[in-house]
Design a protein with these regions (language model features):
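The beta1-alpha1 cofactor-binding region of Rossmann-like NAD(H)/NADP(H)-dependent oxidoreductases
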Residues: 62-72, 105
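Conserved glycine-rich Rossmann-like NAD(P)H-binding loop of the short-chain dehydrogenase/reductase
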Residues: 30-45
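Substrate-binding pocket helix/loop in short-chain dehydrogenase/reductase
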Residues: 98-100, 107-109
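Catalytic loop of short-chain dehydrogenase/reductase
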Residues: 134-149
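A short, exposed helix-loop element centered on a Lys and neighboring polar residues
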Residues: 123-124
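Conserved glycine-rich cofactor-binding loop
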Residues: 14-17
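Conserved NAD(P)H cofactor-binding loop of Rossmann-fold oxidoreductase domains
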Residues: 90-97
Length: 149
């Protein structure tokens, strides 16, 4: 795709499955989607579905906790398109459903890294790309607020 596109750009983090994939497919009807996720195979399957429906996507297989990679992606988006119209943030780490006292240190660390730290780092990276007209949509764990025991 050329650097000039008639379609607005939508960045979808966590695009490989679930809500992220569903949002990427829905947005691809009216946007050029930049799909970010760790799982390359799932991103390629998403791209196949988007293309089959007549849409276009740019795949960015990376982990949002990799600050350097996300900074480079944002620079590349700026250099190629100048801005994004929409950011859908659906990348979350949902630890196994368990009482908090039983949560492993590894799951805790991964949850904080993905759900808090990476999100906090991405906001100032993406705010200039969104400008005053862009919109951001954040999704959280679908089990938030439920009692697990």
């Amino acid at each position: 795709m050329d650097s000039i596109t008639p379609l607005p750009i939508a960045l979808v983090t966590g695009a490989s499955r679930g809500r992220g994939a569903a949002m990427a497919e829905a947005l691809a009807k009216t946007h050029h989607v930049v799909a970010v996720a760790r799982t390359t195979g799932a991103l390629e399957e998403l791209d196949d579905r988007i293309q089959a429906a007549g849409g276009q996507a740019t795949l960015a297989p990376m982990d949002i906790t990799n600050t350097g990679a996300m900074a480079q992606l944002c620079r590349s988006i700026h250099d190629r398109w100048g801005a994004i119209a929409t950011w859908v943030h659906a990348a979350v780490h949902a630890a196994p459903l368990t009482p908090a006292a039983h949560l492993s240190e590894g799951d805790w660390t991964k949850s904080v890294a993905c759900n808090v730290t990476a999100t906090g780092i991405l906001i100032p990276f993406l705010t200039p790309l969104l400008g005053t007209e862009g919109r951001a949509v954040f999704f959280d764990d679908p089990h938030a607020g439920e009692i697990f025991f």
